[in-house]
Amino acid sequence: ICAFIVGATQRTPVNVLPHLYQIIGSFFDTKSITGSGDTIATLVFSSAAETLSRALIGFIIGMVLGYILALLMHLSHIVEKIAFPYLMIIQMLPILGMAPIVLSITGDISSARIIIAAILTFYPVSTNTLAGFKSVGRERHELMRSYGASKFQLYTKMLIPSAMSYFFTGLKISAP
């Protein structure tokens, strides 16, 4: 709305704030903007596809690592006591402050973006999945053990299915 008001007053030069019809028209223009013959539309769509693929790869990596860490923290209280404070520290650090550090470590902007997306996904998935594992009542544990269930059966038949709603809540929180 502000762009229309500023554009209507004609106080800004066209090279600073072009009219809306010029912006839309340039998107559909068939003139090449690069040496390889790309138009604006192909450049925008190819860049969007690259960004989406990096975000999806980082989301999958963070999801898998968060789930594995939650499983390990539930299996061993020592792992939970060691890992949980670091999880809290990672969550407390601002991602914009962490981005230059990740970029300097990796040296590649593409892999840095994937790592940042994984970090953003990692914390909500791991903490929510751990909460899901811990939400199973003691009575259910005792019932499964009275039926002679092994630890593997305890996880596959009771704990993992019970934690799925928490896991998907973590995914929903971490997805933008």
Map each language-model feature to its residues.
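Periplasmic/extracellular loop-to-transmembrane helix junction in inner-membrane transport proteins
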Residues: 9-60
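Hydrophobic alpha-helical transmembrane segments in multi-pass membrane proteins
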Residues: 50, 54-63, 96, 100, ...
